[in-house]
Amino acid sequence: MTLTAVFAVAQGQPATTPQHPQSKLVPRKGSATPAQTTPVAATAGNGNEPDLAFGAFQRGRYITAFGLATQRALDRKDPKSMTLLGELYANGLGVPQDDKKAAEWYHLAAARGDPSAMFALAIFSLEGRAGPRDRQKSAQLMADAAKLGHPIAAYDLALLYIEGQLFPQDFSHAAELLRVAANAGNPQAQYALGTLYKEGRGVPKDLHEAVRLFSLAALADEADAQVEYAIALFNGAGVDRNQQLAVAYFRKAALSGNPIAQDRLATILANGFGVKANPVEAAKWRLISKAAGETDLPLDEFVSKLDPKSRAQAEDEARPWVDSIQRTLAANEHARGAAPAK
């Protein structure tokens, strides 16, 4: 589970030429279990001595890591070793999975100022592991970790300020937090901060800075940023116009499953914008984006006017994608139906 805060910036309907996609400030992708989101430093907390416990952890030697970290935590009161022990217990690596013991080690490390432990406890509190769910407590722990420079905590806390439920909505403070995470190389934060610059929310409107941030996130395979960067490249907005590179980024995002990119790529291929027109591939991507919920009447009309052979080929090429999308939608609907009432 991750934070569910989502800030949507309304955009226009898709047209026959690439437009701005629906922009979202979204949580990072994937689950946010502490093992995935809590970086544990590879050096000791009291010097530059290599951390053998963390080295063993990285190599998958979890029992060895547990023994070394335990010794270091007890002998040196090293907070990073305590956090590593929390990781091992939280995820059942080398020891039986035990949220209670994980939380105990995280608390000891957090009390000694380790931001990774603070963030891990924030996720525990958010998910109700080793205690009741408490978003307020989670937010406070994230704030504590963010103050110490934890990039993912800064990113998640920024989303809470954008959401405006636990805290008063504050785009300016959100931008400051996103900058911490973006400067640390977090692509979701780079994309989110770029969106704020593009919209002029919490920061002066600056398309060049927005595109710069989109480009950084796009290079790190953030699909939404790839779409934004591709649109900027295609239109020459905030960056030199380069339609061929734009098409490459649209295609990359489309292949990753982004329906906006799929729809824009279909438009480009249907009209031959910057590339040779390819009606069959255009129809394929339109069928895929339509299955994912994208509305585009001009493209639908384009597909309907294809000759039967070309349309059949497009349908055959799109079918694996469409089937996968439909299975995912059905599974999500089933999960919503099975969820207990709040």
Predicted regions and their residues:
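Hydrophobic face of amphipathic alpha-helices that form TPR/SEL1-like repeat modules
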Residues: 49-56, 68-72, 82-91, 118-127, ...
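Bacterial N-terminal signal peptides
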Residues: 1-6
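Terminal, low-structured helical/coil segments at or just beyond the last alpha-helical repeat
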Residues: 20, 25-28, 40, 290-342
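Short helix-capping/linker turns of helical repeat alpha-solenoids
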Residues: 44-45, 49, 57, 61, ...
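Alpha-helical solenoid scaffolds that mediate protein-protein interactions
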Residues: 72, 109, 145, 181, ...
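N-terminal leader/linker segments that initiate helical-solenoid repeat arrays
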Residues: 8-83, 330, 342
